[in-house]
Amino acid sequence: MEYTTILVGFLIGFVLFKALTRKSKNLPPGPHVLPIIGNLHLVGSIPHKSILKLAEKYGPIMSLQFGQIPTIVVSSPSMAKEILQKQDVAFAGKRIPDALNAHNHWQFSVVWLPANSLWRTLRKILTSNIFTNNRLEASQHLRSQKVRDLVEYCKKSGDKGEAVEIGQAAYRTSLNLLSSTIFSKDLADYYSETGAPREFKDAIWNILVESVKPNLADFVPILSMFDLQGIKRRAGIHFGKGLKIMEGLVNERLEHRETHGATHNDILDIFLNYCDEHPDELDRHRVKHTILDLFIAGTDTTSSVTEWTMAELIQNPQVMKRAKDELAQVIGKGKCLEESDVARLPYLRCIMKEALRKHPPGPFLFPRRPEEDVEVAGYTIPKGAQVLVSIYALGRDPNSWEDPLAFKPERFLDSELDFRGNNFEMLPFGAGRRSCPGLPMAVRMVPLLLGSLINSFDWVLDGGMKPEDLSMEEKVGLTAQLAHPLKIVPIPVKEE
């Protein structure tokens, strides 16, 4: 980012428009606020780490100022419960990143919409028609096939002694799982990418990149009209490409339905059927945005969890061995898992929980926004403030977790703690009415994928690197990822 541009932008915002937020004498504690920039100078290149250090000083509910935006950071289970459960309705609003104004995308997004009639319609379709146990049971063969495709790709790489970039491989697997579930076709190829599949994959990735870039307009909203950094313009280009591909796939399906009827019974058919039955609630334009939303939210998350977990297993060989021993005993060496196997693999489930605790896909839940002043823990959260729940901090709270920086899956063996939104010590998928609707699919896909990779291969770092030399540095996108992609060589294990 051009720091000169940032400075000029803030000066323009400060000179032309005084801060719109009124001061509150009863804000939670926080650091001294500088003119114009507020506390932005305290947020480093890895914001969730910098903010965790500030929270250790100022407490579990903390006040920051990001440009013109008052920001409240919550970093303890009790405070998270207050925001997400006890006063969920008061904090149901969202603060919209300026990049999502491109093509008015947020106005059709189940993630970003306020709790209005369209949001309730989309949420109902997702939770009652798509991510139900019955439908997920019926589609488990798809997930198994996509995992087998990944294992086959890894075997071919291993036979040639080539390393696999595990995050990218998992990303393609997630992309194909979603596209098969939604459209009944694959949109990614492990071996070559050309034409529409490559264009769509790049569009999704670039939307993610632009959406999370530090944006002047998010700190000084009046600057949105100038788009000084060009973020909204570039986001618009990538949204346009993604929506154009969506439109082509929808039109292709409509032509098929005219001739053959609704024969696929996939997610696209569910949406189109709903459009036909409830045209006053949903139309095809909204469907395109909603499906694009599923790809944006669903692909990066699974790949991030997979990469972090494999990195931790490489660095903790005793955990890898225990996982392999359990898998060998329950299903036999070298075999891919089926979803029905996961219930008999408690240590594998603990590995997933521990990875989600230590490396949640998103370090913060999407920012909440109260529409009125709200009292929390004796403090006043002002109307229009940005409220951030730090999932990263919850998972590393020494009051909740013994030795929180260590990777110890066994901590969950005798624990009832889970990640489905009922235990506020770890909330990787959120809680309450705005929790992730795709959670039921994630809890099926991630252990299936991880277990198959662990059981089908032995893994060594590329180039003879030792596990203790593996970098665990982070970079920040929509999800927190390894700064240096994990490249590991698969050594196929013979089936027994």
Swiss-Prot record:
Disulfide bonds: none annotated. It comes from the Eukaryota. Its main location: endoplasmic reticulum. One of its GO terms (molecular function) is monooxygenase activity. It is a single-pass membrane protein. Its cofactor is heme. Its EC number is 1.14.14.174. It is found in: Endoplasmic reticulum membrane. This is Geranylhydroquinone 3''-hydroxylase CYP76B74. It comes from Arnebia euchroma (Pink arnebia). The gene is CYP76B74.
